[in-house]
Amino acid sequence: MSKEKSYVIALLLSLLLCLSFQVGVSEANYNAVTTRYSDSPRCANGSSASPPTRHCPRGRPRPPTPRVAVHSNSTKGKGP
């Protein structure tokens, strides 16, 4: 009986360790994304006369524009 309890406890501890590691990794990735540009020296002077460069984006980045395939005007192989 005590052997089964120790197996259950070991399983629960390993599950807890795995979940805490996953949370730590996701938080680290989130912090890396949000602080990527704040430590940059280009972003340090907010009162510059020049407009902000692409290195210091404001807000969320735009999603990439969808690429549309160019259709051919050829009639070859299209039937009668």
From Swiss-Prot:
Q: Which UniProt keywords apply?
A: Apoplast, Cell membrane, Cleavage on pair of basic residues, Endoplasmic reticulum, Golgi apparatus, Membrane, Repeat, Secreted, Signal
Expression by tissue: Mostly expressed in leaves, and, to a lower extent, in seedlings shoots, roots, stems, siliques, seeds and flowers.
Where do we find the motif SCOOP motif 1 here? 32-46
Q: Which domain of life is it from?
A: Eukaryota
Q: Where is this motif: SxS motif essential for MIK2 binding?
A: 38-40, 72-74
Q: Name one GO molecular function term.
A: LRR domain binding
State the compartments where it is located: Cell membrane; Secreted, Extracellular space, Apoplast; Endoplasmic reticulum; Golgi apparatus
Q: Where does the signal sequence lie?
A: 1-28
Q: Where is this region: Disordered?
A: 37-80
Bias class Polar residues marks the residues at 71-80
Give yes or no: UniProt keyword Nucleus: no
Q: Give the residue ranges of motif SCOOP motif 2.
A: 66-80
List the GO terms this entry assigns under cellular component, sorted alphabetically. apoplast; endoplasmic reticulum; Golgi apparatus; plasma membrane
- BP-aspect Gene Ontology terms: response to jasmonic acid; response to salicylic acid; response to salt stress
Induction and repression of expression:
Induced by salt stress and salicylic acid (SA), but repressed by jasmonate (MeJA), mainly in shoots.
Q: What is its main location?
A: membrane
By sequence similarity, the record places it as follows:
Belongs to the serine rich endogenous peptide (SCOOP) phytocytokine family.
Record text on subunit structure and interactions: Interacts with MIK2 (via extracellular leucine-rich repeat domain); this interaction triggers the formation of complex between MIK2 and the BAK1/SERK3 and SERK4 coreceptors, and subsequent BAK1 activation by phosphorylation.
What is the role of this chain?
Brassicaceae-specific phytocytokine (plant endogenous peptide released into the apoplast) perceived by MIK2 in a BAK1/SERK3 and SERK4 coreceptors-dependent manner, that modulates various physiological and antimicrobial processes including growth prevention and reactive oxygen species (ROS) response regulation. Inhibits root growth.
User: Under what name is this protein listed?
Assistant: Serine rich endogenous peptide 15
Say which species the protein is native to.
Answer: Arabidopsis thaliana
